[in-house]
Amino acid sequence: MSTAQYIERRFRANKVYITEKQRMGHYTRFDLWCGLIVNVYDTGRVVVQGRIRAFDYYDPLPAIRRILPFDTSWQFSRAKK
């Protein structure tokens, strides 16, 4: 099983909704409902980028951090409320 398939299964099992999944040249891109983009490269490297939408009632980041590998690169910002 590839890293992208493993991460996709973990997202689905933990109710982190994927709005779009695209296979690019040498990586798979997951667009998440909270506004983040997760790129999973064929080498196993994972990069998170984008801007998290502001929610008064929910912070999606702790659930996403538990799912992704510990050596994930984080390049994101938070939207202002």
PLM feature spans:
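Short Lys/Arg-enriched alpha/beta "domain-start" segment
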Residues: 1-37, 59-66
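Intrinsically disordered, low-complexity regulatory segments enriched in Ser/Thr/Pro
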Residues: 36-59
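Mixed-charge, Lys/Arg-enriched low-complexity segments
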Residues: 53-81
